[in-house]
């Protein structure tokens, strides 16, 4: 299954071999017959798409055709260089990111965070909760302040309304006091009017008014004191208010003025005996108005002074409430933070991927670097990706899936490994044309069966890698689009897209190079379709597209022709052997040679497969005819078989006459070697 992404075609750049300096390994120069495309270095952020499709001819491309025809272009073309995993090859920022990720992994293992499903950024949620709490407390504070302001306004209004009420009560009291006087005067004046002799009783009437006015004067102040005491009780600060009112009331000479003026009134009545009762009433009303004015002015002063005392104490009370609320909020936050610290100690968790622990192993750094590179060295994103991968493996029981016996022989034509590239990466071939086989992919159940088999295949391939920093820990993928499903088959492409996304998320940075071959000419304009399938920009930068006419040359740039299968233009034939063909075992002693004789009949084709466990031997094969007059034919020259070479040696020979093929294994080491081989003769 392809895990790569596509790059946009760039402008053609002529390549001059004599002037090119030592090539940078990551620069791509795909082979084309009509147009050579030079992709930018991987440092560029733009996506790179190298197209091998035919384009208009130029003089430069004509020269390129001659070079390709002679084979010079393939021999001199530089392959890519994979990013290294050695500590000496890492930049300082990359080393720091790796150290930070290792610390996060260590903390997660100590807290056993890999056991439970990783919540999408958990710390962010806690911060949000704390932010919400602080926002709520702030809102509450604002509400309290607004309530206090409204209460202050209400108290002011109540006090204002209470003040006129007290004034009215005072007015009523004052009115109530002289009211009987007026009534008495009227009663007494009515009989006095016809007879002026009866004016003498006016003096006692005034005296009565004096007494009556003096008597209610005291209760007026006392009643106001009582009422003023009742009013501040609602606003708590009663003491200061009463003292001020007492002082102001003492300062207000209400009773004295009334006494003096009233004393003056009877003097005038004595001097002016001819004055009528109406003049007395007018004077009394005037005195009452003066009293009202003095009372209202004093009450206004009281009102101006009262709110200041009330608001200060209210503000003090509000501050105390805010302090208690903030203390409660702090206590809540302290409780939420201190809970994990009081938790019981738990043993660190042991987590491994592909049989390698996440820490305490030199191979662990290689795995962690893969996740970092997949997320452009963003440590938190890489850590989240790692946790999600571990959880996905647990949910799908990937470790158990490896040893499970799945029936999927029909899928072996769709995805298979064959040889290695020029740098030693295992090559995985995928044939998208097999998706057209309705017997295999006719319904969702069969598609799910294939996906399970494909995951097992990928897992086995990954586990076969050596994750040491100096080894190759990725693959070269060759995706064949011959007879691939058309764009109209959306359901099938959606399945492919989901499968590729699953591999991108859980097998990061296992793609060294992705070659799309036999891409139809009409498919190139829709290369964005590839981009919709493969989402990783880093994977897209490793993709190369080529049409049917240039597929073989594109593969030969990265894989030697003798290793490429015949169906893709190479020289490597498909193995004629099946599972039923038996295997013979032999032991090669140290510092000795071992020969294997395989008989061959005239006109037959003899094929054999051979593997030496531990390698580090020399291999050679020759045909010796039965007729002594005939010459010996060299089938394979003696060559050294190292540990990095292809593990299985496959060869064949067509005999023109009867004879035998002699295979020689030369072991010059001081350790014995085991040889496994099998052969088959075909007419």
UniProtKB/Swiss-Prot annotation:
Any Pfam family: CRAL_TRIO_N
Protein's name according to its UniProt entry: Patellin-2
Region (Disordered) residue spans: 1-23, 111-279
Example of a GO MF term: protease binding
GO cellular component, one term: plasma membrane
Ranges where the GOLD domain occurs: 580-681
SMART domains reported for this sequence: CRAL_TRIO_N (SM01100), SEC14 (SM00516)
Predominant location: membrane
Protein's gene: PATL2
Role summary: Carrier protein that may be involved in membrane-trafficking events associated with cell plate formation during cytokinesis. Binds to some hydrophobic molecules such as phosphoinositides and promotes their transfer between the different cellular sites.
Subunit text: Interacts with the deubiquitinating enzyme AMSH3.
Subcellular location: Membrane; Cytoplasm
Amino acid composition bias (Low complexity), ranges on this chain: 232-243
Superkingdom classification of source: Eukaryota
Gene Ontology biological-process annotations: cell division; cellular response to auxin stimulus; protein localization involved in auxin polar transport
Entry similarity comment: Belongs to the patellin family.
Annotated positions of the N-acetylalanine modification: 2
Stored CDD domains: SEC14
Other known facts: 'Patella' means 'small plate' in Latin.
Keyword terms, alphabetized: Acetylation, Cell cycle, Cell division, Coiled coil, Cytoplasm, Isopeptide bond, Lipid-binding, Membrane, Phosphoprotein, Transport, Ubl conjugation
CRAL-TRIO domain mapped to chain residues: 404-576
Sequence position, cross-link Glycyl lysine isopeptide (Lys-Gly) (interchain with G-Cter in ubiquitin): 394
Residues where Phosphoserine is found: 79
InterPro entries: CRAL-TRIO_dom, CRAL-TRIO_dom_sf, CRAL/TRIO_N_dom, CRAL/TRIO_N_dom_sf, GOLD_dom, GOLD_dom_sf, PATL, PATL1-6_C_GOLD
Membrane topology: Peripheral membrane protein
């Amino acid at each position: 299954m392809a895990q790569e992404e596509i790059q946009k075609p760039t402008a053609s750049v002529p390549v001059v071999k004599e002037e090119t300096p030592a090539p940078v390994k990551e620069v791509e120069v795909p082979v084309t017959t009509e147009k050579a495309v030079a992709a930018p270095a991987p440092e560029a952020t733009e996506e790179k798409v190298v197209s091998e499709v035919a384009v208009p001819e130029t003089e430069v491309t004509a020269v390129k055709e001659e070079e390709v025809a002679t084979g010079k272009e393939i021999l001199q073309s530089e392959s890519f260089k994979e990013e290294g995993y050695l500590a000496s090859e890492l930049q300082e920022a990359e080393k720091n990111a790796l150290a930070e990720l290792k610390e996060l992994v260590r903390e997660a293992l100590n807290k056993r965070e890999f056991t439970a499903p990783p919540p999408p950024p958990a710390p962010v949620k806690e911060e949000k909760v704390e932010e919400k709490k602080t926002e709520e407390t702030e809102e509450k504070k604002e509400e309290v302040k607004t309530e206090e302001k409204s209460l202050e306004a209400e108290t002011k209004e109540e006090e204002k309304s209470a003040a006129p009420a007290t004034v009215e009560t005072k007015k009523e009291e004052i009115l109530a006091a002289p009211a009987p006087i007026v009534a008495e005067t009227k009663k007494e004046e009515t009989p006095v009017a016809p007879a002026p002799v009866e004016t003498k009783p006016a003096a006692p009437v005034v005296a009565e008014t004096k007494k009556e006015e003096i008597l209610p004067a005291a209760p007026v102040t006392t009643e106001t004191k009582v009422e003023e005491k009742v009013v501040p009780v609602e606003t708590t600060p009663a003491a200061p208010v009463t003292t001020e009112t007492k002082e102001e009331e003492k300062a207000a000479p209400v009773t004295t003025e009334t006494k003096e003026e009233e004393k003056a009134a009877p003097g005038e009545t004595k001097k002016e005996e001819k004055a009528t009762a109406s003049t007395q009433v007018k004077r009394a009303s005037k005195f009452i108005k003066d009293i009202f004015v003095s009372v209202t002015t004093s009450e206004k002063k009281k009102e101006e002074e009262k709110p200041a005392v009330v608001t200060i104490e209210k503000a003090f009370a509000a501050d105390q409430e805010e302090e208690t609320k903030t203390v409660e909020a702090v206590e809540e936050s302290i409780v939420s933070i201190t809970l994990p610290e009081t938790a019981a100690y738990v043993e660190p968790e042991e987590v491994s991927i592909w049989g390698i622990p996440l820490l305490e192993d030199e191979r662990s750094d290689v795995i962690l670097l893969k996740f970092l590179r997949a997320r452009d060295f963003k440590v938190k994103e890489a850590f989240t990706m790692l946790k999600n991968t571990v959880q996905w493996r647990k949910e799908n029981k990937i470790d158990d899936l490896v040893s499970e016996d799945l029936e999927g022989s029909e899928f072996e034509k769709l995805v298979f490994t064959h040889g290695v590239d020029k740098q030693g990466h295992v090559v995985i071939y995928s044939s998208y044309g097999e998706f057209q086989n309705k017997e295999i992919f006719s319904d969702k159940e069969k598609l799910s069966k294939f996906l399970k088999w494909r995951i097992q295949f990928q897992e086995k391939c990954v586990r076969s890698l050596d994750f040491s920093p100096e080894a190759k820990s990725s693959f070269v993928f060759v995706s064949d689009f011959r007879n691939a499903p058309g764009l109209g088959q959306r359901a099938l492409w959606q399945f492919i897209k989901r499968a590729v996304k699953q591999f991108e998320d859980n097998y990061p940075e296992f793609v060294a190079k992705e070659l799309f071959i036999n891409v139809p000419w009409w498919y190139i304009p829709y290369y964005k379709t590839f981009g919709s399938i493969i989402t990783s920009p880093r994977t897209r930068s490793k993709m190369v597209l080529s049409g049917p006419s240039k597929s073989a040359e594109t593969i030969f740039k990265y894989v030697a022709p003798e290793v490429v299968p015949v169906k893709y233009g190479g020289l490597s034939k498909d193995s004629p052997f099946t599972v039923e063909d038996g295997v013979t075992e032999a032991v090669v002693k140290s510092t000795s040679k071992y020969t294997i004789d395989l008989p061959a009949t005239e006109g037959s084709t003899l094929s054999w497969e051979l593997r030496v466990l531990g390698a580090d031997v020399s291999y050679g094969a020759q045909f010796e005819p039965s007729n002594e007059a005939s010459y010996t034919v060299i089938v394979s020259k003696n060559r050294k078989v190292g540990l990095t070479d292809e593990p299985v040696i496959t060869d064949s020979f067509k005999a023109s006459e009867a004879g035998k093929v002699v295979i020689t294994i030369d072991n010059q080491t001081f350790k014995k070697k085991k040889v496994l081989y099998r052969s088959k003769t075909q007419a």
